[in-house]
């Protein structure tokens, strides 16, 4: 049974990720947002330990409130790129937004998925 569930999750994740290029075309980042992409936040060369930072262009030296965005997907699917437009819109409201990637189940245990969030 667990192999069936794991296979279903993996297929759902694959199907979900196929929509990423179309989402990038439909949702452009608004002007006035500086993006810093794929910054390593754990020194282990794991692609799942990257974050994106969104900062309003017009206030590079100003202290601003921070939002940490953790993408949804029940720890089994999703990626920070799916929330890129949402994070940019929050940035336009005057926030610095950190959007993190994290390890997913079943490649990693539930605990290892949560430890860096």
Spell out what each predicted region is:
Residues 14-61:
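N-terminal cap/lid segment of alpha/beta-hydrolase-fold proteins
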Residues 57, 96, 101-105:
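Short beta-to-alpha linker loops that shape the active-site pocket of alpha/beta-hydrolase fold enzymes
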Residues 115-117:
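Conserved small/polar residues in nucleotide/adenosyl-binding loops
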